[in-house]
């Protein structure tokens, strides 16, 4: 701690003052508490043990959650960063516009809310569960794993090299992008939600509800997709769809696209 030394007219380390005078005046003690409080409010707290609740990470600040540390109900504002790794855990973090949450090596983030302009990155063995993308973005790559993400209107999830997503729910206006080396399994597409499978990307066991769309681009692969009434699967030239089940939905296969072992049930249509 630092204190004001009236004789020196300067701030000094408290331990030095104690050695020189043998005590610290009550006035100086009050100053110590005031300075400590100000520092605590000005900077994000790194967390390596215990639980820190309701913290705020502001512009230019980085909060690191690691080891056995946990945070609850943190808020990451514009320009702020929350890094979760090495056994750290966060619950119910809110990431606002231009804020970021990075979930890395053995880190876990549960029930994060990512608002418009915010981003959550999941990589290097990091795990997330029940992230809500309320207009924000989630990028999953390099052995990152995201489960039970919900993508609302304006939100987007990108799964790339080595990234895994399972049980994502895409609501109307939301979008999932599966690019090279990424895998999405058990995705549900609702309303006007969209799943785009790009070259080298793979989607397994997608369920498409009314108004939802799965686009399989050149080099992309979709397997065991279920297309329900008024849902769409579109397979472009060079794309491949295997084992699609049309339960009242539609499959459109462009010239050069492949549809293998499709099953067409009542109300289903393949063109």
Predicted regions and their residues:
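Bacterial Sec-dependent N-terminal signal peptides
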Residues: 1-34
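Extracellular beta-strand-rich, repetitive "passenger/adhesive" scaffolds
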Residues: 45-70, 78-271
